[in-house]
Amino acid sequence: MKKKPIYLWVLLILSALLSAISLFGLISPVPTAESMGNIESSGVDATYAKELIAYTIKVTEHAHSIFNMILVVLSAILVVVALVFLVRKNIQLANYTYIGYVFLAILGSIYNFIGVQDAVSLFTDPNIRMGAELGAKGSAIFGIVLNVIFLAIVFYKMWRQQKELTEAQEEEELA
């Protein structure tokens, strides 16, 4: 009896959730200084509030760039296509499509890290800048490591499937 690719279902469901969150981020509007004016009135230091507003706007504009939109839409399409292949029990094509998604997700993590680094320079306080840089680096590293782990799982399972197929063919030849 052939094993079910539970690993791929789990990975694709997690990736579909992440893609849905990214698509929602594209739909949300870019904030303006006026819409974020309540930060200044919340008792926060005025300089920090202005820098935080500028940082938030810059990061959101970067997230709404054409390149990022293409990355997000392509990743969502790849997840849907991989799910369709999986439902149709074409595991090999689902694996290859998912590998394409993972490489695209790694590219997206790097692109977002570069965009945040540009926005971090808006903070004048070195402690705040360092905190924002650490958050950006941590987020990028987490995203890349997570995707590399997903990639390793898929490659390992593909290798095992190929090994089992080869062993089954050898047994047929001997019989």
What do the PLM-derived regions correspond to, one by one?
Residues 78-112:
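Loop-to-transmembrane helix junctions at the membrane interface
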